Amino acid sequence: MRRDIAGIVLAGGQSRRMGGGDKSLLPLGSGSVLDQILSRFGPQIEILALSANGDPERFSRFGLPVLADTVEGFAGPLAGILTGLEWAIAGTPCKAVVTAAGDTPFLPLDLVDRLAAAARDHPGSIAVASSAGRRHPTFALWPTECRDALRHFLVDEDNRRVSDFIERHGHVEVEFRFVQSAGLDPFFNINVPDDLAQAARLLQSMTS
């Protein structure tokens, strides 16, 4: 378990195509999507928080800090990443933050270690996950030293595209393979009801 890197779950994504509310709180298996994410992400990292706006009480049973955006206007995942960096700088000894999307229940069990290894070989760079040739910009290791540049990018330039900032800052990609036994992309995410049903089937097959 890493103690030198903080983890942030970007948990405030809305399920507009699924009736509203937080995608991370949708039911999955015996718990929620977020329960499943934390069962895989939590053992990798000691210092962990949730990024979400609105009433933090809806996440109270998880026992984790809930970080509201420090940038106004619901500026998307990049605002959550910035807030996570600011929280890590102000309240932890960590020099980097690993983020994970709150709608991706099968994230890799070695996500943090592999991103950290890549970042160690490329000091100052953002280490970002990819699979099958596709980059997953919300699954990345962000050095705390990029905080000021990120705030300028988001606030002063009003650019909310995560990939644009990654390209500008400098990055290294880390390829994660599909889970061969299930043919599963570890970054499979839930956007529509069919995705949630598929996630339930996959989870059942993995635990049976």
From Swiss-Prot:
Pfam families: NTP_transf_3 (PF12804). Its cofactor is Mg(2+). It catalyses: Mo-molybdopterin + GTP + H(+) = Mo-molybdopterin guanine dinucleotide + diphosphate. GTP binds at residues 10-12, 23, 69, 103. GO terms for molecular function: GTP binding; metal ion binding; molybdenum cofactor guanylyltransferase activity. It comes from the Bacteria. Its EC number is 2.7.7.77. It is an enzyme of class 2 (transferase). Mg(2+) binds at residue 103. Its main location: cytoplasm. The N-terminal domain determines nucleotide recognition and specific binding, while the C-terminal domain determines the specific binding to the target protein. Monomer. This is Molybdenum cofactor guanylyltransferase. It comes from Mesorhizobium japonicum (strain LMG 29417 / CECT 9101 / MAFF 303099) (Mesorhizobium loti (strain MAFF 303099)).
